């Protein structure tokens, strides 16, 4: 009968209960609230009460979480939230399929894997294409996953070096006007890249390869006039490049190289009337076969759940605030 309550059962191994259930059963409570079911745990057996569709979705979701837990994953609230969004689309099995895509381990032995469909598509694009643009809000893993792919290619001797770069003009500051030598000037801008490499490679391995010139972390301006062969190159914060800077960077690419360009169009530090090189490149290059584009969204945020809510709130606010821009003239071939 339509709307009738059914009862389903599933088992959770005793050694995985705390991981799957969450602290104070927060994961189960979240599943209950979202899918409108009741979950009762007794001696490792879960009794799920709800409508036929909701109870079935809850059972599939919990079974997927158990599979993830058995593979050594720590189940987080973000995992559960994402699993619930997939359950709403009747795509529960996608979560464990994504989890099969192993990239590498951190120095502490933690596996690095894509955690969402958007991240999986991004990683697949990196494997297939010579140049990939990964664009999306903070917390979507676009830079970290690119770093993990770079380290994997380096370890597998697919490339002979890793080059990481960022535009060094952010928040209105120019390197030439900052005190100190080059290293002290660029460190604040490049620190996030160092931190990610330390976590993946370990400080000792990073320092050794840096000393040998096999890893280079430098401002974007230092790419000018070079040809970058047999390298895995990551340009981070590309929304802060000008069209000329990004064109300069992309034309440095040599044989045997792979390039990842990451950026967040909502966090530009360019002067108000400046055109972002990232925006221009995504329009100009979209029809070239060996260039991939991956647009990550708030659904792909894998930091604290609050970050996802912040991103969504700002997106909604900016859509309301965005004025109609009058047509402008052209300078240097780019619309201003």
Q: What are these model-derived regions, one by one?
A:
Residues 2-19:
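Short glycine-/aliphatic-rich beta-strand segments at the starts of folded cytosolic domains
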Residues 3, 21-24, 41:
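A positional/architectural concept
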Residues 15-33:
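Short amphipathic alpha-helix segments
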Residues 20, 27, 58-61, 246-249:
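Hydrophobic side chains in well-ordered alpha-helices
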Residues 29, 35-38, 44:
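Compact, well-ordered interaction domains used in eukaryotic information-processing assemblies
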Residues 40-99:
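Interdomain "pre-motor" coupling segment immediately N-terminal to P-loop NTPase/helicase cores
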Residues 89-117:
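Conserved loop-to-helix interface motifs that mediate assembly, gating, or partner/ligand docking
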Residues 107-119, 125-235, 239-336:
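Conserved helicase motor core of SF1/SF2 NTP-dependent helicases
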